[in-house]
């Protein structure tokens, strides 16, 4: 329909342009000379041109309708051939189907090659769009399945994430890999596990040690009490300070007969030098013990 309207516009516009050129070419003097006859001739010519345009448009419409009918018939034939081919070959891809459509169509008739080529292109474009839509639907469905199904927690094997020593301990060796690692003792740290006999011997030893410690503690306490009692007895034999003993001995008698010594006064004044300066004169006072230092 769009092509039909464009052809009509082109055909309608061409005579008006011709008339405009003719009218421009005619000078004013010739129009005055010809007068009414020239105007009537121009009007008749324009009417004839319009009739020719309408006839050409009608012919184009009839040709276009014939082309459409031919295209529909060829499309039906192509559909039948495609159905037969699909029944014969179930594993055929969509691409050869499109090529068969192009090749199976009959040659155009009545000179409508360009329009039929355009219709073929539209059919092929529709098929390609349908195929692209199917592919997009398939990709969307694949994405939905991918997101709906949970991913496994461990995509890589466990042996790939272990060290060489860990694999050797568990006995997992790769191709061409030799077990050259030294195996450490299983219990390098921690307490040693004892047998029941060793446990019984250890308990007996601990009981013996506790018994010896208690006996030693008792002996020490006994010795402390004995020393304390002996110390008290030795203190009771001594006279108290300031009192004479009840039984005078030879030592006490000799002490009483001894001459008493003079008691030394422990108080000593502060030793200092005194300097005195008056109108009569100055003087220096020095204590007796310090005179030898100033002589």
UniProtKB/Swiss-Prot annotation:
Annotated Basic residues bias: 102-120
GO MF: DNA binding
Composition bias, Basic and acidic residues: 194-225
Annotated keywords: Chromatin regulator, DNA damage, DNA repair, DNA-binding, Nucleus, Phosphoprotein, Transcription, Transcription regulation
Cellular component, GO annotation: Ino80 complex; nucleus
GO annotation, biological process: CENP-A containing chromatin assembly; DNA repair; DNA repair-dependent chromatin remodeling; transcription initiation-coupled chromatin remodeling
PTM-bearing positions, type Phosphoserine: 128
Region annotation Disordered: where it falls in the sequence: 1-265
Keyword Iron-sulfur: no
Subcellular localization: Nucleus
Record's compositionally biased regions (Polar residues): 16-29, 246-255
Comp. bias (Acidic residues): 49-93, 125-139
Subunit architecture: Component of the INO80 chromatin remodeling complex.
Family to which the UniProt record says this protein belongs: Belongs to the IES2 family.
Function: Component of the INO80 complex which remodels chromatin by shifting nucleosomes and is involved in DNA repair.
PANTHER family, per database record: INO80 COMPLEX SUBUNIT B
Name of the protein in question: INO80 complex subunit 2
């Amino acid at each position: 329909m769009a092509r039909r309207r464009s052809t009509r516009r082109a055909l309608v516009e061409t005579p008006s342009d011709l008339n405009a050129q003719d009218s421009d070419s005619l000078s004013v003097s010739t129009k005055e000379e010809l007068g009414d006859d020239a105007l009537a001739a121009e009007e008749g010519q324009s009417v004839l041109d319009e009739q020719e345009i309408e006839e050409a448009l009608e012919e184009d419409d009839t040709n276009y309708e014939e082309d459409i009918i031919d295209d529909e018939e060829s499309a039906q034939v192509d559909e039948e051939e495609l159905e037969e081919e699909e029944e014969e070959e179930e594993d055929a891809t969509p691409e050869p189907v499109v090529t068969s459509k192009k090749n199976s169509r009959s040659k155009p008739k009545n000179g409508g090659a360009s329009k039929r080529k355009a219709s073929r292109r539209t059919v092929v474009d529709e098929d390609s769009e349908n195929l692209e839509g199917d592919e997009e639907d398939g990709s969307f469905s694949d994405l939905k399945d991918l997101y709906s199904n949970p991913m496994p927690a461990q995509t890589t094997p466990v042996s790939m994430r272990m060290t060489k020593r860990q694999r050797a301990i568990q006995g997992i060796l790769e191709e061409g890999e030799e077990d050259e690692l030294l195996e450490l003792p299983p219990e390098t740290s921690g307490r040693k596990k004892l047998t029941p006999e060793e446990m019984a011997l250890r308990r007996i030893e601990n009981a013996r040690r506790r018994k010896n410690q208690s006996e030693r503690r008792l002996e020490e306490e006994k010795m402390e009490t004995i020393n304390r009692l002996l110390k008290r007895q030795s203190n009771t034999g001594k006279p108290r300070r300031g009192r004479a003993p009840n039984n005078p001995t030879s030592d006490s008698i000799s002490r009483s007969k001894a001459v008493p010594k003079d008691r030394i006064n422990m108080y000593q004044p502060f030793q200092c030098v005194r300097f005195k300066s008056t109108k009569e004169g100055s003087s220096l006072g020095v204590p007796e013990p310090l005179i030898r230092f100033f002589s």
